Curated annotation (Swiss-Prot):
Self-association state and partner proteins as the record states: The complex is composed of two ATP-binding proteins (MetN), two transmembrane proteins (MetI) and a solute-binding protein (MetQ).
Name of the gene encoding the protein in the UniProt record: metN
Domain ABC transporter: 2-241
Keyword Cell inner membrane included in the entry's annotation: yes
PROSITE patterns the record matches: ABC_TRANSPORTER_1 (PS00211), ABC_TRANSPORTER_2 (PS50893), METN (PS51264)
Protein's name in the database: Methionine import ATP-binding protein MetN
EC class of the enzyme, as a word: translocase
Record's function text: Part of the ABC transporter complex MetNIQ involved in methionine import. Responsible for energy coupling to the transport system.
Catalytic activity from the UniProt record: L-methionine(out) + ATP + H2O = L-methionine(in) + ADP + phosphate + H(+); D-methionine(out) + ATP + H2O = D-methionine(in) + ADP + phosphate + H(+)
Highest taxon above the source species: Bacteria
Length: 359
């Protein structure tokens, strides 16, 4: 549905050229919800504005539904843009128009008759739950309702793609969940491809199928959301998901582990982080490892959550036993689909708050 090929975007800055995008390659499938996440200044908004050519890239190709937008100009580009709706953080509603009038605006510009406009606008207002507010003005409705107007307006031309540029960043958590639920409903009912630009991992966790992490204008990691959350490969990704899947252990937990490791036990101790998702969480893997390899396991920290109804989580486990048995247990867990990280350093003095990434 959407393909970006070697996209570069350079702007003029006060001290010289600024490279906002540096060789971005991206492929988004029809009907999926695709998240693009990064810190402020990473290039997220530049990327979303390239998709509909609000900003024409300095180099590279943009293809949407098989058409190369970068080869279009004038009327041909304006017609192609009707297949791409967009919603913004600050709503961008016309204060002089009612809710109905704001949704009708793109249809008026497209030249539809009053009857055709009514036939489209009324179902859209019903879809977003604003039929009773059709005659109100933006100043008379809440922020969440304004964003619902923005969504209805973005859908007015029956687009194939919906771009969401930080659309929930100005909303409270409850309203954010409501708007994301509406986007999920639209995606499922109409098969609409949705691209979510955000700095909030909670947004990605709730609705996205796949995600790309952007940093300094480059895509540094991408994949299914559940894989990226449970097996982050890049430092930027680990930092972004820390609010949902903590990457460091609390000091109180580290203190208990130091006590365990310095207890003078004759068998070796090892701290492991186990990351699991989906069906892996339903199997009695820890009890199986204890029975099979004769080692002791103590859960010292853990968290379990869900991504779109699928369980995922991580456990910090202190394992004690003979080195050969510990290695065999780790190999067994990895073979069962559990991602296992081992802490750097076997002695208390080498114990740190983070996990290494030994595969």
């Amino acid at each position: 549905m959407i393909e970006l090929k070697s996209i570069f975007q350079t702007y003029k800055g006060p001290t010289g050229p600024v490279e906002a995008l540096r060789g971005v390659d991206l492929q988004i499938n029809p009907g999926e919800v695709y998240g693009i996440i990064g810190r402020s200044g990473a290039g997220k908004s530049s990327l979303v504005r390239v998709i509909n050519l609000l900003n024409r890239p300095t180099a590279g190709q943009v293809l949407v539904d098989g058409r190369e937008l970068t080869s279009l100009n004038g009327d041909a580009l304006r017609v192609a843009r009707r297949d791409i709706g967009i919603i913004f953080q600050h709503f961008n509603l016309l204060s002089s128009r009612t809710v109905y009038g704001n949704v009708a605006l793109p249809l008026e510009i497209a030249g539809l008759s009053a009857g055709e406009i009514k036939a489209r606008v009324e179902p859209l207002l019903d879809l977003v739950g604003l039929s009773a507010l059709a005659d109100r003005y933006p100043a008379q409705i809440s922020g969440g309702q304004k964003q619902r107007v923005g969504i209805a307006r973005a859908l007015a031309n029956r687009p194939k793609v919906l771009l969401s540029d930080e659309a929930t960043s100005a909303l409270d958590p409850e309203t954010t969940r409501s708007i994301l639920g509406l986007l999920q409903q639209i995606n499922k009912e109409f098969g609409l491809t949705i691209v979510l630009i955000t700095h909030q991992m909670q947004v990605i966790k709730q609705v996205a199928d796949r995600v790309a992490v952007i940093d300094a204008g480059r895509i540094v990691e991408s994949g299914p959301v559940i894989d990226v959350f449970t097996r982050p490969q890049h430092d930027t990704t680990r930092s972004l998901i820390a609010e949902i899947v903590p990457q460091d252990l609390p000091e109180s937990v580290l203190a208990r582990i130091r006590t365990l490791m310095s207890a003078g036990h004759p068998e070796e101790g090892q701290l492991l982080r186990l990351a699991f998702a989906g069906d892996e969480s339903d199997r009695p893997l820890l009890s199986d490892v204890i029975r099979r390899f004769g080692i002791d396991l103590s859960i010292v920290h853990g968290q379990v959550d869900e991504i779109q109804g699928k369980p995922f989580g991580s456990l910090a486990v202190f394992a004690r036993g003979a080195r050969e048995q510990l290695n065999a247990a780790v190999a067994h867990l990895r073979g069962a689909g559990v991602h296992v990280d081992q802490v750097d350093g076997a002695l208390p003095g080498g114990l740190a708050g983070g996990f290494s990434h030994v595969q």
